[in-house]
């Protein structure tokens, strides 16, 4: 009997230890997600990684370079945005990592990337059963780096995250630099009081690196079947930028959306409405205190209604309230926001920017009034 109890105890300890080892990943950087742990000198030839498992926690395939901040490529100095190391994916090269997740849960991946050659570059990101292509030829940040987000729904308890460079460049070493890969579990948006808009304050969204001052790009809907911004769709050719209070001016709460691509940068949400009933849509329009100056206009659409809210930006923060009252013409109403104009930062970097929207509310009203 004593031996049976001891065997049972050992079995329970073994099971519990496996549970701990396979616990779902927590929000934040993946293991060695910033690539600060690198290959041994014997596993490299110059900057090229020669062994598949040489970068701790990652598997590599193809021409992958381990880049140190300040390393030179021809006459260009390669800059690493966070920490001192990153990886560069050559033609058809990839890196991947397996992690434990909760099946059925929506997750968002955030990563930083930069192109290192003049050619347009794309990056394929995938999990076990989903994939998307992220274009990185347009630069939104003044530092040469941008952070991107991509969402997926976990199909099982373990998934493999893979970054793949599908490009065929003239120079085999050309390819995107990747740094700081993080994950965040997303929760389904809920209604707040009488507000019919879900996640109208944009507080639920992709992981934001605490030290990254350039925000996180959310790709167009055509690039992503699951939105990293719960409740919202990015229905445009360009991305929108997710900004945080720590580095930008945010009208309300801790997060907001910057429309950085003019009319090519739009977000929308479909809400339930009652036919022939009147509704009031209100929202904040401002600037992110990121040097985006000049006259701005945000266009808001709901049903057959439209309003254009102007805002004179000095690039130092601030906002005003916009309002649209409309009559519902169907049981479902699409609410859409876009920027009328294209804007660039005043630092002459050529970086795109735009107006910020926040605190979106939609409530039923008794009758049509201003």
From Swiss-Prot:
It comes from Arabidopsis thaliana. InterPro entries: DGR2-like_dom (IPR006946), Galactose-bd-like_sf (IPR008979), Pectin_Meth_Modulator (IPR052437). This is Protein DUF642 L-GALACTONO-1,4-LACTONE-RESPONSIVE GENE 1. Disulfide bonds: none annotated. The lineage of its organism: Eukaryota, Viridiplantae, Streptophyta, Embryophyta, Tracheophyta. Residues 1-22 form the signal peptide. Gene3D superfamilies: Galactose-binding domain-like (2.60.120.260). Keywords: Cell wall, Glycoprotein, Secreted, Signal. Expressed at low levels in roots, seedlings and leaves.
């Amino acid at each position: 009997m004593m031996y049976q109890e001891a065997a049972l105890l050992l079995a329970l300890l073994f099971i519990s230890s496996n549970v701990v080892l396979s616990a779902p990943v927590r929000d934040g950087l993946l293991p060695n997600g910033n690539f600060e742990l690198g290959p041994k000198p014997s596993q490299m030839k110059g900057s090229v990684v020669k062994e598949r498992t040489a970068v701790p926690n990652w598997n590599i395939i193809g021409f992958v370079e381990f880049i140190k901040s300040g390393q030179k490529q021809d006459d260009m100095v390669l800059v690493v945005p966070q920490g001192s190391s990153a990886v560069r994916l050559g033609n058809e090269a990839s890196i991947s990592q397996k992690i434990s997740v909760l099946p059925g849960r929506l997750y968002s991946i955030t990563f930083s990337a930069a192109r290192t050659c003049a050619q347009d570059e794309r990056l394929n990101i995938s999990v076990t059963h989903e994939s998307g292509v992220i274009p990185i030829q347009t630069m939104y940040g003044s530092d040469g780096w941008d952070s991107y987000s991509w969402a997926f729904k976990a199909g099982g308890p373990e998934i493999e995250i893979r970054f793949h460079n599908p490009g065929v460049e003239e120079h085999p070493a050309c390819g995107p630099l990747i740094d700081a890969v993080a994950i965040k579990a997303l929760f389904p948006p809920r209604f707040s009081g009488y507000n019919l808009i879900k996640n109208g304050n944009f507080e639920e969204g992709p992981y934001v690196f605490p030290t990254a001052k350039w925000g996180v790009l959310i790709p167009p809907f055509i690039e992503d079947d699951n939105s990293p911004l719960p409740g919202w769709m990015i229905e445009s050719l360009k991305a929108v930028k997710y900004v945080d209070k720590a580095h930008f001016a945010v009208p309300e709460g801790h997060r907001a959306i910057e429309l950085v691509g003019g009319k090519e940068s739009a977000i929308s949400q479909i809400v339930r409405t009652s036919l022939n009933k009147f509704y009031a849509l209100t929202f904040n329009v401002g600037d992110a205190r990121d040097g985006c100056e000049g006259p701005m206009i945000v266009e808001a659409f709901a049903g057959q209604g439209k309003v254009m809210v102007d805002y004179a930006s000095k690039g130092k923060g601030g906002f005003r309230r916009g309002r649209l009252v409309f009559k519902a013409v169907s049981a479902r109403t699409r609410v859409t926001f876009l920027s009328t104009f294209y804007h660039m930062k005043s630092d002459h970097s050529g970086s795109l920017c735009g107006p910020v929207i926040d605190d979106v509310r939609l409530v039923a009203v008794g009758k049509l009034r201003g």
